[in-house]
Amino acid sequence: MRECISIHVGQAGVQIGNACWELYCLEHGIQPDGQMPSDKTIGGGDDSFNTFFSETGAGKHVPRAVFVDLEPTVIDEVRTGTYRQLFHPEQLITGKEDAANNYARGHYTIGKEIIDLVLDRIRKLADQCTGLQGFSVFHSFGGGTGSGFTSLLMERLSVDYGKKSKLEFSIYPAPQVSTAVVEPYNSILTTHTTLEHSDCAFMVDNEAIYDICRRNLDIERPTYTNLNRLIGQIVSSITASLRFDGALNVDLTEFQTNLVPYPRAHFPLATYAPVISAEKAYHEQLSVAEITNACFEPANQMVKCDPRHGKYMACCLLYRGDVVPKDVNAAIATIKTKRTIQFVDWCPTGFKVGINYEPPTVVPGGDLAKVQRAVCMLSNTTAIAEAWARLDHKFDLMYAKRAFVHWYVGEGMEEGEFSEAREDMAALEKDYEEVGVDSVEGEGEEEGEEY
């Protein structure tokens, strides 16, 4: 069995975790107490959803997940909420003291007190697995726990489980909507530390999600619940192939193989369609061609950047629901005729396609309409460098004046770590730039030879 362990770190990670597990339970018909009326074989264990849930002797399904936060209030809501019986109490780990939006506290001071406990719980989950394939880590870039503790955890996971893949789902600080002044510091420090430990990181930009909620769902003032449910749908689409019997991306490592041409350029852009409210969906039926086209609209992306200014290195389309290959091929053929989509010249313009016949599920009473078919596009494009450039610029503005740096140094960091992290980010931007440059040299002599 190819199990996958989810780790939810910090407030953002935990709240997205709530949205995701709520959705997974609905998709698999698992009740909030972990019982699954439709599953007649107790302890069968060979169903696809067993990659995400383990089954107890009593027929209860328990998520293979760990929730960690350095302060208790957010996880206390899980402990008292609707799904309190779903999780084993040991899976919900809290500290006493907040990381206070400070990377150094999450990574050094407070983080180190709790890391061994967390790894111990992860080890217990890993021991229940017959063939663990890897971890997905959910966190924000901006928070202290999300940035600092995650990077510490990723380092330790690399030591303990060297060859297992590690996927990240990271909440990128929104360009306009900010929850902390020091977000750029935290983001750049955590990216620098986790860059070599993460195999693939899906970034989600809060502002992009806000705009989608406002524009497509007509929610004037989206709350975090609205945002998280939308993010939950996206995560569910990405992981659907691991949880249902699909034909493609049945494996975490397959994502990397298809999306990551160079180890450092591992930040695919996710786009999801259709995001549509119930009132609108009642009147229109969206075809495969329409939802496929929607994926190439910057408005539906999870990160604000413009792929029309960049080049694609890889592209993966994950369909779910009532979709047949014939329609998909037609839709892709149409898109290839549009010149707006440019691939790097060293990469064949192949679109990898996965079809999952399980239609998307929605949370009852939520904002999203129940649709017959949906698609999630994962593309690795050089345009994502725009997002890093924005962040680096904000970092530079503050760091030039050494603003707020004393809070980090006071927790035992050295100022050198800042400049080292910033240099690494500059290198990352450069990497993306170089990938997009055409490989011109050496073309002259090849023309004469026909193979």
Swiss-Prot record:
Q: Which residues bind Mg(2+)?
A: E71
GO biological process per UniProt: microtubule cytoskeleton organization; mitotic cell cycle
Q: Where is the active site?
A: E254
For the modification 3'-nitrotyrosine, which residues carry it? Y282, Y451
GO terms for cellular component: cytoplasm; microtubule; motile cilium
Question: Where in this protein does the record say Phosphoserine is found?
Answer: S439
**The keyword Magnesium is assigned to this record:** yes
SUPFAM superfamilies named among the record's database cross-references: Tubulin C-terminal domain-like, Tubulin nucleotide-binding domain-like
Could you say which cofactors this protein requires?
Mg(2+)
Q: Which residues carry this modification: 5-glutamyl polyglutamate?
A: E443, E445
Where in the cell is the protein located? Answer: Cytoplasm, Cytoskeleton; Cytoplasm, Cytoskeleton, Flagellum axoneme
- Lineage, top-rank taxon, reads Eukaryota
Which InterPro entries would you find in this protein's record?
A: Alpha_tubulin, Tub_FtsZ_C, Tubulin, Tubulin/FtsZ-like_C, Tubulin/FtsZ_2-layer-sand-dom, Tubulin/FtsZ_GTPase_sf, Tubulin_C, Tubulin_CS
Q: What is its EC number?
A: 3.6.5.-
Q: Where is this site: Involved in polymerization?
A: Y451
Query: Which annotated residues bind GTP?
Result: 10-12, 15, 71, 99, 140, 143-146, 179, 183, 206, 224, 228, 252
Posttranslational modification, per the record?
Answer: Some glutamate residues at the C-terminus are polyglycylated, resulting in polyglycine chains on the gamma-carboxyl group. Glycylation is mainly limited to tubulin incorporated into axonemes (cilia and flagella) whereas glutamylation is prevalent in neuronal cells, centrioles, axonemes, and the mitotic spindle. Both modifications can coexist on the same protein on adjacent residues, and lowering polyglycylation levels increases polyglutamylation, and reciprocally. Cilia and flagella glycylation is required for their stability and maintenance. Flagella glycylation controls sperm motility. Some glutamate residues at the C-terminus are polyglutamylated, resulting in polyglutamate chains on the gamma-carboxyl group. Polyglutamylation plays a key role in microtubule severing by spastin (SPAST). SPAST preferentially recognizes and acts on microtubules decorated with short polyglutamate tails: severing activity by SPAST increases as the number of glutamates per tubulin rises from one to eight, but decreases beyond this glutamylation threshold. Glutamylation is also involved in cilia motility.
Q: Which family does it belong to?
A: Belongs to the tubulin family.
What is the role of this chain?
Tubulin is the major constituent of microtubules, protein filaments consisting of alpha- and beta-tubulin heterodimers. Microtubules grow by the addition of GTP-tubulin dimers to the microtubule end, where a stabilizing cap forms. Below the cap, tubulin dimers are in GDP-bound state, owing to GTPase activity of alpha-tubulin.
Q: How does it assemble?
A: Heterodimer of alpha- and beta-tubulin. A typical microtubule is a hollow water-filled tube with an outer diameter of 25 nm and an inner diameter of 15 nM. Alpha-beta heterodimers associate head-to-tail to form protofilaments running lengthwise along the microtubule wall with the beta-tubulin subunit facing the microtubule plus end conferring a structural polarity. Microtubules usually have 13 protofilaments but different protofilament numbers can be found in some organisms and specialized cells.
- Name this protein carries in UniProt: Tubulin alpha-1A chain
The gene name reads TUBA1A
